[in-house]
Amino acid sequence: MSEATLSSKQTIEWENKYSAHNYHPLPVVFHKAKGAHVWDPEGKLYLDFLSAYSAVNQGHCHPHIIKALTEQAQTLTLSSRAFHNDVYAQFAKFVTEFFGFETVLPMNTGAEAVETALKLARRWGYMKKNIPQDKAIILGAEGNFHGRTFGAISLSTDYEDSKLHFGPFVPNVASGHSVHKIRYGHAEDFVPILESPEGKNVAAIILEPIQGEAGIVVPPADYFPKVSALCRKHNVLLIVDEIQTGIGRTGELLCYDHYKAEAKPDIVLLGKALSGGVLPVSCVLSSHDIMSCFTPGSHGSTFGGNPLASRVAIAALEVIRDEKLCQRAAQLGSSFIAQLKALQAKSNGIISEVRGMGLLTAIVIDPSKANGKTAWDLCLLMKDHGLLAKPTHDHIIRLAPPLVISEEDLQTGVETIAKCIDLL
């Protein structure tokens, strides 16, 4: 057997031996994938209900995206931003018009987009709001996940997984301030900080429209309108992290659109499905006024805006538009959540909660009703029966299939979950 076709057993053995152990994957090996289907090296078929954390909204190896990738790869892959390239210019025009913003800054990973936004917010605070130098504050909310870099983990309240032995953290970047906690979904928690003497130094608030890693936590419908109003009142930027929730996943192009706030965010972050899972592509969207705080040399990336990524991202967004995947996610998501709630009612309390929006959903498992079995145990059973999902926070299973999944496969997924719950 060649290295290109390792067995599942050999793959796991080599990864355990040669790779850092910074992940704890389910014991399944991806060999090839198409749409919502995945095959392991031995040919077993699985349904993908994770979508690489919503990076493959368009489905694995979408032909339109792969065609764009292969054609561009034979023409030009990298210029760096030391020179212009004609594909990035097309992407910049396309993505800003697609999402209704004035300007874009391209990066690669979602975490890079977050760091870019934090830097941009600080610069804006000093250059536009006249915050005293080195006093700018950026606030988040408890339970957030914005990535693994220092700025992102400084915002985190998940100490054991995100912060243990990584300190000290970035000053004035936190999801709380002094004695004030900031609970997600509680806009009033920002008020004591914004109205304190230090409130004038708050440059930005960064939030997820739905908290993903926290277990698909959907805020009250009036949360973002209230936060947006507070930001306008106190001259604070609102940064919305749509890296996991955006690009059709919840049934709207941006999840923030569900909340009908009077003002759109000042800064929006995109990643993951921006390339359909083909390449690392991310970006920061904002206004000319805010983005003008970056000047040549103040921020950048060798690979950000490269022609290969730019061409792929255009194709990925074309798929969302042309295949009406926002509408599809809304329609299928409504049916999926209804089926999960029906399953909850028959689960004898094993499923304690169903939550989500569109095709970004989760079920909460109560181990006390499941013979002490956990969400991990249920995911292992589901894997054995051909359905792939991953727990988060021990007792929650995120369910987020590609938006192109068929109704039949979605139904099969629900039936598989039901069967595996009976086997717990």
UniProtKB/Swiss-Prot annotation:
Organism the protein comes from: Saccharomyces cerevisiae (strain ATCC 204508 / S288c) (Baker's yeast)
Positions of post-translational N6-(pyridoxal phosphate)lysine modification: K272
Enzyme class: transferase
Descriptive protein name: Ornithine aminotransferase
Alphabetical list of CDD domains matching this protein: OAT_like (cd00610)
Gene that encodes the chain: CAR2
A GO molecular-function descriptor: ornithine aminotransferase activity
Disulfide bonds: none
BP GO terms, sorted: arginine catabolic process to glutamate; arginine catabolic process to proline via ornithine; L-proline biosynthetic process; ornithine metabolic process
Pathway: Amino-acid biosynthesis; L-proline biosynthesis; L-glutamate 5-semialdehyde from L-ornithine: step 1/1
Sequence similarity: Belongs to the class-III pyridoxal-phosphate-dependent aminotransferase family.
Cross-link (Glycyl lysine isopeptide (Lys-Gly) (interchain with G-Cter in ubiquitin)), chain numbering: K390
Cofactor annotation: pyridoxal 5'-phosphate
Coiled coil: none
